[in-house]
Regions:
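Contiguous, well-folded functional domains in the mature portion of proteins
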Residues: 1-125
Length: 125
């Protein structure tokens, strides 16, 4: 699931569920337009692996874009986090990719606008 942020959006990233941060991995890279498919592999990014209370793994990837040249992450390995908690930001747009386990229910559709801390985007099953 990908949420694109433009320069006018709120750039704070929030945890999709409650759990413990299993690891954080920063990868330097390019600053291609975030909507391009190759940005997934080539752009600067920061991945946060979350181990949920139910044992499911959820991966949140902050991806920098053409204008966004700074990723900030406030969590580290072993941190306990709550659903909706702010964990980072991407300055001036870009995108957030969230990978849920197979079988999870996606609660939004392509083109929907979401609001941080309010919109339920998916449910773990």
């Amino acid at each position: 699931m990908t949420v694109f942020l433009n320069v006018f959006d709120v750039h704070v990233n929030r945890m999709p569920c409650t759990g413990t941060v299993e690891g954080v991995s920063y990868q330097p890279g390019q600053f291609l337009v975030a909507s391009k498919p190759e940005a997934t592999l080539r752009n600067e990014q920061n991945a946060v692996m979350l181990n949920t209370e139910s044992g499911a793994k959820v991966l949140c990837v902050q991806v920098a874009g053409l204008i966004a040249r700074r990723i900030v992450c406030w969590v580290g390995q072993g941190d306990r986090v709550q659903r909706g908690e702010r964990f980072g930001l991407i300055r001036f747009g870009s995108r957030m990719d969230t990978f849920l386990p197979l079988g999870s229910k996606i609660c939004v559709s392509l083109g929907d606008r979401v609001k941080g801390g309010e919109t339920i985007v998916g449910e773990l099953r």
